[in-house]
Amino acid sequence: MFRGASAINLDAKGRLAIPTRYRPEILEQNQGQLVCTVDIRQPCLLLYPLSEWEMIEQKLLSLANFDPALRSLQRVMLGYATECALDGAGRILLSEPLRQRAKLEKNIMLVGQLNKFEIWSESEWNAQIEQDMVLGSSSEFALSDALKTLSL
């Protein structure tokens, strides 16, 4: 399970070092294999262990592609999906199209979301968190049906 937010740097070649606390799980359960794609709703990337991505892929493939919205989702998520392998130093290489799509430069955030990571530019992450905090204190957030049943 991937938890927490880590501020990390992309090197000049577009590589990022996965924090050491996550590496054993990625290596043991997925032989260091990950898949990165874009988030269709947010300006970030989604980084899945290969086994998690294979489940997402099956869900995407099972959708009827006659629906233009579903076809767009498939096109974007599958079209950008790129396999990334941990190298000997625990780094992965993010392709140029992925980096451009998420506006990634040197300072980035790797954010654990239990079964996957989100990869954000640091500035986009800070803006999103600020927006989420404002929403969290609003009455709209409290009125969500799904949140009414959530016990933390």
Curated annotation (Swiss-Prot):
Keyword Transit peptide in record: no
Keyword Repeat among record annotations: yes
GO BP terms: negative regulation of DNA-templated transcription initiation
Domain SpoVT-AbrB, chain residue ranges per copy: 5-52, 81-124
Protein name: Transcriptional regulator MraZ
Pfam family, one: MraZ
Keyword terms, alphabetized: Cytoplasm, DNA-binding, Repeat, Transcription, Transcription regulation
Subunit structure: Forms oligomers.
Location in the cell: Cytoplasm, Nucleoid
Top-rank lineage group of the source organism: Bacteria
Any one GO MF annotation of this record: transcription cis-regulatory region binding
UniProt GO cellular component terms: cytoplasm; nucleoid
Family assignment from sequence similarity: Belongs to the MraZ family.
